[in-house]
């Protein structure tokens, strides 16, 4: 670990891309007790408990359609399986996401590529020299991202020809 408790700063691609981001499995634990205990706390803890209560009401209301909107890099940060589980277990009815979330994160990983734990303090010059892109403290292999883009281009080119 280095300053600011991040993964150690490396200087070559192999050392920079050594720790894969692991996606959370919401089926592996029960968070209800800790969230319920947050009702008696302050700040965002209490807000989280209140949000959970509202969400439970929404789930139990058969006339309520729940849309999950995703912007930002939460898929790359380890929430990818969370979204599919929310659909699988009827906890959301629809997902609306940005192109970056769908292509550069979800589709990217469906091709077998990974996101890696990084460090927000890593020198951008070192990253660029190693063809690594940074999403805050997450790394992505630029060459793999280009392969993802080329794959998308193949599909969209075929669709445009139809």
Positions of PLM-derived features:
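Conserved small/polar residues in nucleotide/adenosyl-binding loops
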Residues: 155-160
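Metallocofactor- and cofactor-centric catalytic cores in central/energy metabolism, strongly enriched
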Residues: 2-137
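Active-site- or DNA-interface-adjacent structural scaffold in DNA-acting proteins
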Residues: 139-149
């Amino acid at each position: 670990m280095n300053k600011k408790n991040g993964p150690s700063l490396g200087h070559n691609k192999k050392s920079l891309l050594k720790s894969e981001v692991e996606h959370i499995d919401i089926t592996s634990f029960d968070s209800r007790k800790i969230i319920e205990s947050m009702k008696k706390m302050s700040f965002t803890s209490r807000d989280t408990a209140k949000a959970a209560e509202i969400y439970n009401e929404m789930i139990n209301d058969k006339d309520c359609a729940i849309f999950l909107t995703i912007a930002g890099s939460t898929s790359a940060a380890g929430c990818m399986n969370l979204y599919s589980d929310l659909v699988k277990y009827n906890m959301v009815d629809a997902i609306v996401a940005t192109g970056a979330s769908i292509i550069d994160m979800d589709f990217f990983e469906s091709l077998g590529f990974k996101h890696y734990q990084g460090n927000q303090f890593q020198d951008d010059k070192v990253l660029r020299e190693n063809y690594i892109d940074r999403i805050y403290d997450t790394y992505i292999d630029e060459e793999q991202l280009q392969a993802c883009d080329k794959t998308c281009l193949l599909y969209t080119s075929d669709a445009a020809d139809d």
